[in-house]
């Protein structure tokens, strides 16, 4: 029995070993296949990676080429624009190329003579015809300065003065307009204050009781008229009669004003004014009785 058991156990152990060996062989086969497949996959991956690297390397070269072309075009366009605008701004601006290769415009420094010429009204800027239009702003454009023309004043003719025996002619200026038409303006002589006083004295003399005493006349002589002033003959005054002045209701007021004026004049006494009042009252009574 023990021998059988030993043989069975020995057989069982061999079978297990075979199974294990087979299993190991299967794993080995699988692992071997995997190992064989790995180099192919690696080769394929390497090819893909190399292709991607080639593509990635080639693409930046194209972009750089395009960028260089654009830069060249921009420089050419700038040069073309500068050459086209150089005719308009050649007098005022200069084109200078910087270290970076960019074209920069700089304004020329104008001399004192050019500035003075620009300020003169007759100076015309030739570059203004080709200058670019000003930038559009909300404010209106300033109007050009209008030319100022000053007309020389016409000399006035000398006044003509003729001296007579008792009459002085005043100056009459004559102004010519447009060469054909003429206007004359005669200056009327103004009577001085002394002549006005003489006119009042004449009125007072015509009034009753307005005569001055001889002593007053000798004491205060009337001032002599200045020779330079033109002698004008006063118009003959027609004073109303004393009776009419008394009969009118406004006669008293008029007399009061005249009395005040007469009081202020030199050589006039109040007694003469009272005599005038008494005479006026007498004439009024005479009228009422009539």
UniProtKB/Swiss-Prot annotation:
Region (Disordered): 1-290
Compositionally biased region (Acidic residues): 90-101
Induction or repression: Induced by cold stress. Induced by drought stress, salt stress and abscisic acid (ABA).
GO cellular component terms given for this protein: membrane
Pfam families: Dehydrin (PF00257)
Coiled-coil segments: none
Family the UniProt entry places it in: Belongs to the plant dehydrin family.
Record protein name field: Dehydrin DHN1
Organism of provenance: Oryza sativa subsp. japonica
Gene transcribed to yield this protein: DHN1
